[in-house]
A protein has these predicted regions:
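Flexible glycine-/small-residue-rich
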Residues: 40-44, 59-63, 84-88, 150, ...
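C-terminal lobe/lid and adjacent interdomain/linker elements of RecA-like ASCE P-loop ATPase modules
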Residues: 55, 111-171
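GG-anchored amphipathic helix commonly corresponding to the ABC/SMC/Rad50 NBD signature/C-loop
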Residues: 57, 61-64, 77-99, 123
Length: 171
């Protein structure tokens, strides 16, 4: 019984992996990773309650580069943008109440910043999204803005967080 169930699960995973990889690869093209590729590798594991394989995410950030494990080759900004793409693609099927993105726009320009901002705004329709950003294109998509200010007296540095009013948001 287990072997038959595991075989069915593997078949479903293979089919889903192809669709998911194609969707993430498409999102990468709009997130300043032109020519990049995303793949899902099914890695055999000993029999367990989750089947006989686990999923490994692979990526190539540029054309002509072989795919490698995502965790080993992605920069912080690439990892954040791929995470954003994955959350956007899976948001209908997950119930994560809060997402936090730290400089997801790192290393990108204005046009990509607009795409990133729109994707986060879409996610924000069904959950809370917090984002640390320096790009006005990303910030413009937010509903509320907080400013982090650091103050130093020469001995110690203290950070303050304050909510911005509509006038302060455009400064």
């Amino acid at each position: 019984v287990y072997d038959a169930a595991a075989e069915r699960l593997t078949k479903v995973r293979r089919e889903a992996a192809v669709r998911f990889a194609k969707a993430v690869t498409n999102e990468m093209q709009t997130l300043s990773m032109k020519g990049g590729r995303f793949e899902v590798n099914l890695v055999p594991i000993p029999r367990s309650e989750v089947g006989v394989e686990k999923c490994e995410f692979l990526m190539a950030g540029h054309p002509g580069v072989d795919v490698s494990p995502l965790a080993k080759v992605a920069s912080g900004g690439e990892l954040s943008r791929i995470g954003l793409a994955i959350f956007t693609l899976t948001s209908r099927n997950t119930s994560v109440p809060t997402l936090i993105f730290d400089e997801v726009d790192s290393g990108v320009g204005g046009a990509t910043g607009e795409v990133v901002g729109r994707m986060m705004k879409q996610l924000g329709q069904t959950r809370q999204v917090l984002c640390v950003t320096h790009l006005p294109q990303v910030a413009a998509c937010g509903d509320h803005h907080l400013k982090v200010e650091k103050v130093s007296d020469g001995i110690e540095t203290v950070s303050y967080l304050r909510e911005l009013n509509p006038t302060q948001r455009v400064e």
